[in-house]
Amino acid sequence: MRQKTLDVLDFDKIKAQVENEAVSDLGRVKAAAMTPASDYETVVFQMNETDELSQIYNKHRLPSLSGLTEVKPLIHRAKIGSILNVRELNQIKRLIQVQNQYKTFYSQLLEEEEAINYPILDERMAQLPILTDLYQEIHQKCDAYDLFDDASHELQSIRSRIHSTSQRIKQNLDRIVKSQSNQKKLSDAIITVRNDRHVIPVKAEYRQDFNGIVHDQSSSGQTLYIEPSAVVEMNNKISRLRNDEKVEVERILSVLSGEVAAEADACLIAESVMGQIDFLTAKARYGQSIKGTKPEFTEERNVYLPKAFHPLLDRATVVANTIEFAEDIQTVIITGPNTGGKTVTLKTLGLIIVMAQSGLLIPALDGSKLSVFDNVYCDIGDEQSIEQSLSTFSSHMKNIVEILKHADHNSLILFDELGAGTDPSEGAALAMSILDHVQKLGSLVMATTHYPELKAYSYNREGVMNASVEFDVNILSPTYKLLMGVPGRSNAFEISSKLGLSGNIIREAKSLIGQDEQEINNMIASLETNAKKVEDQRIELDRLLREAKQVHGDLNKKYEQYQNYEKQLMDDAKVKANQRVKAATKEADDIIKDLRHMRDEKNAEVKEHELIEKRKHLDEQYEGTDIKQNVKKQKWDEIQAGDEVKVLTYGQKGEVLEILDDDEAVVQMGIIKMKLPIADLEKKKKAQEKPAKTVSRTNRSAVKMELDLRGYRYEEAITALDQYLDQAMLSNYENVYIIHGKGTGALQKAVQQHLKKHKNVASFRTGMPSEGGFGVTVAELK
């Protein structure tokens, strides 16, 4: 987009405000470089990216980005072998710290807001590298000012020796300065440092009383700073140790710089992502400051800005207006009084387009719709009049000529006072001709004018709409309200009357302009009133429609969640019911086999109370279980005496002995004879029965599907596990749950090692999170 357009629309002032919202140099650089895009995909992406972070910013307290600085030059120096100092290493450490804090914050955010998606920020966060090791290396070896003494054993040893030697020097010098005989010879009883050497201040006249080296003197020459001979060698030792310290510090910094170089690419990625995060946060803060909203971009041509206002004007006094190009409208012509807000309306439209295509939230109500323009062209300047020089008209015309050379169907053109600065009749003719030409190009145009001829222009052209800025004749002042679809009207008679002009003069003037002109003015006045009502109603309807869509979407989502939940419950219930039916059927079969075995045993004595007890046990296995719903029933009239049937309620085979009149039959099940409803019987083909073996059963209801071994010692746990697996096999369980807890993992390992060797275990696995996770092992039985 042309820089001239951005300058005219004051986009630099918007950029400066966004830049002020950034915390780091990285964010400020990106804000200063912000320019509008013209590619549809890019524009939509930038807006969505800003909107995602704005949603988070408006609901949460974001991690601090303070202290974030550009590290790219430091990374480059490290890569070529330069040694970074402690301050520079801390800049890299702060970058890593900031990115780690943001990753943690974002992870927690996603856990709290599972139903909300931030796809662009997801991708940004996924790009952030893992730099924990580099952070720890820097963090453990230095603070913000210097290396720690324990950054290496050698450095610790050197600094320890420096400290002990310094203490010895101070002890020696303390004895000298505190000696009674030396009190009058010293300028002050202190120990000081000159040229990195410990010295004492001696009066010049007592120089001969102190053996040593003079390192400095006072400005008056009356005090000499002498290093006594007794500490010269110790000071020399400290100098040597200081050199050793410098070498060791340089070595450590070199190692740390090498580690930075090894992670150079990762550090640059972190810098890029966190710089973008700061830039987006600045956009979000700015958007909140203007109560900005996210517009909807459409690929077809569309401009609808409900209650839009200029973001650089005082929010407390600025008048918001709805700006719209209806579906079939290509040109909007605004008429109205001077200083009535026409130029501000042009700039508002142009600036909002530029802001939106730069990824900034716009100063308008929710529901805005915008096209993406390749270019915005402006001819906006101070108001012109025919008294002004021809050079002013020429400069405007030169600008218009340049615009017409480059404009196309995907351009927005803003003309302020089109055709002004020359003879009114010629200016109006030029304006209409220019608008005709631009309409052929297909550009979207908004123009302001004083010429009354252009009011009629819209009625003679398709795709052209009138608009006007309102003037309040009661207070003789413009209201700055834009009325779309309503041409401006002359208020000369009303203004003159308010100012005290004679009514006779006004009536005579009205008679001179003709009845048609008066009727047109009256019609325009009526249109103004109706237009304001319609606009307010439309904005309210748009709001209600958005709310209805939001509610509809929420209800659809909740209904979908309910359906999924219901389906899950049904699926779980079916699985549990099938398992229960299968187990109950197996249990019943085994009980009947036991009864038959008791009957067939030569020496067995089957008493009536035992049969009743066994039958009661059989009934208990199926209490509350409705198997009939899951089995296809046989028609009643097909069952006859002598048929072999399956009793659906008990899942057992039997033989029909007799059909009764009241839809019941007498059925022999093994040694039990029962009267049952025919509807509970299913006809089976007769088959020779194999002799059954006696099986000792465990009452399944007494065996749980889980075994809790928490708190058991190893031997106790294995014994309990073996006993439980035997009982589970007899209960015909397919899967069982062994609860061993997490702890140290020793019990889990022991259980799984034992399950590997157990003859009745087909396989096993660690529990899912919903089953208890690592604290549970699920075993599948053979």
Swiss-Prot record:
GO terms for molecular function: ATP binding; ATP hydrolysis activity; ATP-dependent DNA damage sensor activity; endonuclease activity; mismatched DNA binding; ribosomal large subunit binding; rRNA binding. Belongs to the DNA mismatch repair MutS family. MutS2 subfamily. The keyword Hydrolase applies. This is Endonuclease MutS2. PROSITE patterns: DNA_MISMATCH_REPAIR_2 (PS00486), SMR (PS50828). One of its GO terms (biological process) is rescue of stalled ribosome. Coiled coil: none annotated. Homodimer. Binds to stalled ribosomes, contacting rRNA. Keywords: ATP-binding, DNA-binding, Endonuclease, Hydrolase, Nuclease, Nucleotide-binding, RNA-binding, rRNA-binding. Endonuclease that is involved in the suppression of homologous recombination and thus may have a key role in the control of bacterial genetic diversity. Residues 707-782 form the Smr domain. Its EC number is 3.1.-.-, 3.6.4.-. ATP binds at residues 336-343. The keyword RNA-binding applies. Gene3D superfamilies: 3.30.1370.110, P-loop containing nucleotide triphosphate hydrolases (3.40.50.300).
